[in-house]
Amino acid sequence: MRRQLRSRRAPAFPYGYGYRLDDQDEVNQNYLADEEEEAEEARVMVVPDLEEEEKEEEEEKEEDEKEEEESHHQDTRSAWWQKLQIVNEYLWDPEKRMSLARTGQSLSLLLVIYFFFYASLAAVITLCMYTLFLTISPYVPTFTERVKPPGVMIRPFAHSLNFNFNVSEPDTWQHYVISLNGFLQGYNDSLQEEMNVDCPPGQYFIQDGDEDEDKKACQFKRSFLKNCSGLEDPTFGYSTGQPCILLKMNRIVGFRPELGDPVKVSCKVQRGDENDIRSISYYPESASFDLRYYPYYGKLTHVNYTSPLVAMHFTDVVKNQAVPVQCQLKGKGIINDVINDRFVGRVIFTLNIET
């Protein structure tokens, strides 16, 4: 600063003038003050100029970005428009008068070729199906060598085959009673006497004639189940802790018990103490499916056929604990030990009677 003052000091006046040294200092101070004011004004002017330049640069960047986005959208639109034009020209080209890159004559020829091709294919398939159906009888299965031995089912329905109920609480067993009553409606004595015939027991009921001829069915009356018929005890023993469970074999067309011996039913404790079940009564008393209900001729001709039943009356079962029960079919040709299928020749369920 002192150097600037020295360089800008006012010129020396000749001796002829009457100025004093104090006047020279005052002049130098005035120069210094003027320079400071100019510097301050320059600083004040420079700051707004820089801010304005930054704002202008930001605005220019934003404008450039907008222009880039608009150009990108325009490029995208133009690309889509070009694709649509290509598709439109492929579907119909008015200049060449072509559709799908083919003339009308070539398209007509192509349609004719495809028509005859698919018509021939449909005719071959129809002929094969017709020939196949000629060899299949709707009344008798063609292939029976792979049919498994009969499986079994029980009534009433129970969730997971677990019969859990409390004797003193009717709400816990009433649904079993309703299920049994509904299932046995088709076995009512009056209905069986009206629809089916009274067949002699102990022998097959073989009916000759055409396979499409209606077949007769033997009576299986509800009264055959005695204490488990619901006629004498409407609760089927559930109110006294002596439940009845009905078992039937699945129907198989043409099935006959081998050697002329009826298939029997046997129940026991599956695992655990065998004394958990001390007494079981079977109805009919033979605990078997009589031969007169076989063979079965199929639902198309054996319309009124009624599957025979065996009722198990569990009269003395340990209470207040779960008892696993297994009921098996016994007879020649019957398989009842398949591990992977618990319903082939046997059924397993649980009794849990609370008091």
UniProtKB/Swiss-Prot annotation:
GO biological process terms held by the UniProt record: potassium ion transport; regulation of DNA-templated transcription; sodium ion transport
Membrane topology according to the record: Single-pass type II membrane protein
InterPro entries (UniProt xref): Na/K_ATPase_sub_beta (IPR000402), Na/K_ATPase_sub_beta_sf (IPR038702)
Membrane-crossing residue ranges in chain numbering: 109-129
Signal peptide interval: none
Gene Ontology cellular component list: nuclear envelope; nuclear inner membrane; sodium:potassium-exchanging ATPase complex
Membrane side Perinuclear space: residue ranges: 130-355
Compartments, as annotated in UniProt: Nucleus inner membrane
Pfam (any one): Na_K-ATPase
Region (Disordered): 35-76
Tissue/organ expression: Expressed in skeletal muscle (at protein level). Expressed during postnatal development in skeletal muscle and heart.
Domain of life according to the entry: Eukaryota
Ranges of the Nuclear topological domain: 1-108
Entry keyword annotation includes Membrane: yes
Keyword Transmembrane: yes
Assembly description: Associates with a SMAD7-transcriptional complex. Interacts with SNW1 and TOR1AIP1. Does not associate with known Na,K-ATPase alpha-subunits.
Family that this chain belongs to: Belongs to the X(+)/potassium ATPases subunit beta family.
PANTHER family found in the cross-reference section: PROTEIN ATP1B4, SODIUM/POTASSIUM-DEPENDENT ATPASE BETA SUBUNIT
Reported function: May act as a transcriptional coregulator during muscle development through its interaction with SNW1. Has lost its ancestral function as a Na,K-ATPase beta-subunit.
This protein's name: Protein ATP1B4
Lineage of origin: Eukaryota, Metazoa, Chordata, Craniata, Vertebrata
Name of the gene encoding the protein in the UniProt record: ATP1B4
